[in-house]
Amino acid sequence: MTINNYDYDYLIIGSGFGGSVSACRLTEKGYSVAVMEMGRRWKAEDFAKNNWNTRRWIWRPGMKLFGYFNMRFFRHVTIICGNAVGGGSITYANTLLVPPEHIWDEGTWADAADWKNEMPQHYAEAERMLGVTDNKIFGPADHMLKKMGEAVGVGHTFKPTRVATFFPPEGEEGGKTYPDPYFNGEGPDRGTCTACGGCMTGCKHNAKNTLDKNYLYFAEKNGAKVYEETKVVDVKPLNGKADGSDGYEVTTGCSSSWFNKQRRTWRVRNVIFSASSLGTQEMLFRLKQSGSLPNISDDLGNRVRTNAESILGVRFFGKDVDMSKGVAIGSSIYIDHDTHIEATRYQSGSDAMGLMCTYMAKGKPGWTRIFFWLWALICHPFIFLRMSNPVSFARQTLIFLVMQTADASINMRLKRNWFWPFGKVLSSEGKKLPVYIPQANAFTEKVAKMFNGHPMTTITEILFNVPFTAHCMGGCAIASSPERGVVDGQNRVFNYKNLYVVDGSMLGANLGVNPSLTITALAERAMSYIPAKHTLEEQAYTQTHNEVLEAAKVSA
């Protein structure tokens, strides 16, 4: 088979940070690229006014909800992710941080590469492409977090977040449109940030540097084809070559239709899984169990991490309060060496997440905390009910996104659950993840009392002892052998050729910070190992020519 028999050189599953970077760099190297994305393409004018419009916010196609925000519930954790052209960048909080250096000495990837020497250049390129800068707009939530830090003696740790936002020039109001400010005029026109707080509900001002404005934009400009609302249902090696050395046959269908699945088959030379940590794990489990890719490492699904995360906050009642102004995450403090707290907000009117929050009760995780929660309802029914009312939640609430570097993980498996025996579903196993972070809860209660607010947590934490996370990592970890991970130090799937994993599932340790920048930098690194197409063709020609000469010598 020759390369001309393929529909594409590379087929990429997913258009998030890993997929968009891969598409951009591969098209630059001359390859033909297809990107399969389950979600829809969104423009600034398409986003809903607020997140009460569930049909345009939640992604649940089986219920005819075609938004971009996905929430998946497991026994051990509730995971938030994004489904859209541009992946999680459409709905993430726009925060891009470099993790501490020690993470490269930990986990499965420690001996897979010389990370500390290699990664700085890739972080720098990722920051350049994503337009990362210090937050320049401090809203009331940021000023309040600074006061809180000072009140408990950690004010010196307060700092602005690093965000991918196009801010207005000093002294100018946001909302003005400019020609591309990042790529010498080669990129799209951009609008400046208005500090509306709507980063996580879709930026309506073209100020958020989502992937469709940088990596994916240039990938399409260079010829990549993005197939939206398309789900990959099968990937199997071509021509009976079990290791994929001849490429793969990929079957796709429509992700948004109940009945008209629009099945289609593609012949491709290489496949890159970039479907998010959960999406890639689930897909590889199904392909392994169905026999399409049976030699995927048995380590698949192991050590899924969450940044040891917790969502807390303080709610301030009153008409004059407005914590919604600013970027989604504008500042942070460290309350101790391991515990990082970020000031987080939603746009005014986007109060739907308030349904997931409740009054913070004292006590340790488990039934005693439920008892204290019910006792609070009896003792303070008026405050309790106000805390449970989502109306004005975004304006009144300073949300704390708490993260730690503590290494805790669960395992994912594809199996039949007792309550749904009709098909296999992705399920969590292992020890409980840390939910109750004592120092973070103590800080929240203390500053709430000091600043006349009320401490808040999530209802899943109180009732089910289950944490929330937007940072699902691992499950297809980078490692030096298939006994310890799923991909090698260059993101190549063990036991296969021409098969890669480039997304959050590749992370081999707990980062302790928002992972998007690290995923981007690792994707840059993975693509740097793939030579330009013309180089491969020259090598193939030389090899064929040499083989012909050798054959001629033998026959002579």
Swiss-Prot record:
It holds the Pfam family NAD_binding_8. InterPro entries: 4Fe4S_Fe-S-bd (IPR017896), Cholesterol_Oxidase (IPR052542), FAD/NAD-bd_sf (IPR036188), GMC_OxRtase_C (IPR007867). Keywords: Cholesterol metabolism, FAD, Flavoprotein, Isomerase, Lipid metabolism, Oxidoreductase, Steroid metabolism, Sterol metabolism. It catalyses: cholesterol + O2 = cholest-5-en-3-one + H2O2; cholest-5-en-3-one = cholest-4-en-3-one. GO terms for molecular function: cholesterol oxidase activity; isomerase activity. One of its GO terms (biological process) is cholesterol metabolic process. FAD binds at G18, E37, G88, A93, V235, G504. Pathway: Steroid metabolism; cholesterol degradation. Its cofactor is FAD. Belongs to the GMC oxidoreductase family. This is Cholesterol oxidase. It comes from Acinetobacter baumannii. The lineage of its organism: Bacteria, Pseudomonadati, Pseudomonadota, Gammaproteobacteria, Moraxellales. The gene is choxAB.
